[in-house]
């Protein structure tokens, strides 16, 4: 069975306050995006890796790869207008049948255990996402103010979100709506249940300068 990692990296670094897109920022001298690809290559050296990047960033990425001697085999697809369209472009390069894991390019600290768990369960469950517990108190905003809700009723969603390849391709044939906030929401729109597995708290999404400091501490 074919395994594919589809890495989506379309950020512009606005929240980071940097001219350099966040996926290219270095952690201990190595770009975030390279560390992310390495995590999946470490899990399965034969895995197909597809990187989705805005066309205007692709030459710079190739220059970075040459500069760092980065030789992990991967294909590049053009980023789209939205994340939905970016993933759809990447899916066009998926080889054959199997399972596809879609992962944020700025989550380099996903554990090998989480990757294995998601891909293993997706073979049986067809649609799997990693989640972690909410540890802070949560309040729901109302017209009159706000109210406390039970944090036990909520989970924080991470990536990779892993699906049967055929199912995922059919899901992405749907018309785009703003309610598609992640891949699970696209698949759920077809009436397909999504199975939850345990993620890892270190699997942070690097989007702010503070996140970069945390990332450096995690090495």
Swiss-Prot record:
Write out the coiled-coil annotation as residue ranges.
none
Please provide an example of a Pfam family that matches this protein in its UniProt record.
Answer: IspD
One example GO MF annotation:
2-C-methyl-D-erythritol 4-phosphate cytidylyltransferase activity
* EC number(s) reported in the record: 2.7.7.60
Give the catalytic activity. Answer: 2-C-methyl-D-erythritol 4-phosphate + CTP + H(+) = 4-CDP-2-C-methyl-D-erythritol + diphosphate
Q: Where is this site: Positions MEP for the nucleophilic attack?
A: 151, 205
| Pathway(s) per entry | Isoprenoid biosynthesis; isopentenyl diphosphate biosynthesis via DXP pathway; isopentenyl diphosphate from 1-deoxy-D-xylulose 5-phosphate: step 2/6
A biological-process GO annotation: isopentenyl diphosphate biosynthetic process, methylerythritol 4-phosphate pathway
Pinpoint the site Transition state stabilizer: 15, 22
Q: Does this entry carry the keyword Transferase? A: yes
Q: What class of enzyme is it?
A: transferase
**Which CDD domains does the record match to this protein?**
CDP-ME_synthetase
Could you list this entry's UniProt keywords, alphabetically sorted. Isoprene biosynthesis, Nucleotidyltransferase, Transferase
User: Function, please?
Assistant: Catalyzes the formation of 4-diphosphocytidyl-2-C-methyl-D-erythritol from CTP and 2-C-methyl-D-erythritol 4-phosphate (MEP).
Q: Which NCBIfam families match?
A: ispD (TIGR00453), PRK00155.2-3 (NF001186)
PANTHER family with a match to the protein in the record? 2-C-METHYL-D-ERYTHRITOL 4-PHOSPHATE CYTIDYLYLTRANSFERASE, CHLOROPLASTIC
Query: Which family does the record assign?
Result: Belongs to the IspD/TarI cytidylyltransferase family. IspD subfamily.
- Protein's name according to its UniProt entry: 2-C-methyl-D-erythritol 4-phosphate cytidylyltransferase
Organism annotation? Bacteroides fragilis (strain YCH46)
Gene name, please? ispD
């Amino acid at each position: 069975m074919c395994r594919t990692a589809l890495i989506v990296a379309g950020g512009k670094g606005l929240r980071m306050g940097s001219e350099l897109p966040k996926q290219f920022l270095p952690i201990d001298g190595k770009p975030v995006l390279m560390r992310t690809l390495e995590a999946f290559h470490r899990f399965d050296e034969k895995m197909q890796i597809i990187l989705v990047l805005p066309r205007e960033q692709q030459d710079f990425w190739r220059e970075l790869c040459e500069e760092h001697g980065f030789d992990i085999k991967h294909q590049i697809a053009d980023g789209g207008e939205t994340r939905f369209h970016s993933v759809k472009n990447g899916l066009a390069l998926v080889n054959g049948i199997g399972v596809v894991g879609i992962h944020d390019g700025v989550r380099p600290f996903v554990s090998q255990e989480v990757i294995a768990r998601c891909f293993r369960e997706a073979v049986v469950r067809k649609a799997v996402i990693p989640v972690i517990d909410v540890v802070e108190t949560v309040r729901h905003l109302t017209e009159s103010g706000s109210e406390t809700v039970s944090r036990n009723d909520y989970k924080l969603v991470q990536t990779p979100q892993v699906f049967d390849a055929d199912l995922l391709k059919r899901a992405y044939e749907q018309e785009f709506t703003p309610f598609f906030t992640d891949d699970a929401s696209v698949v759920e729109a077809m009436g397909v249940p999504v199975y939850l597995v345990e993620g890892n708290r270190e699997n942070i999404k690097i989007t702010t300068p503070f996140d970069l400091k945390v990332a450096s501490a995690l090495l």
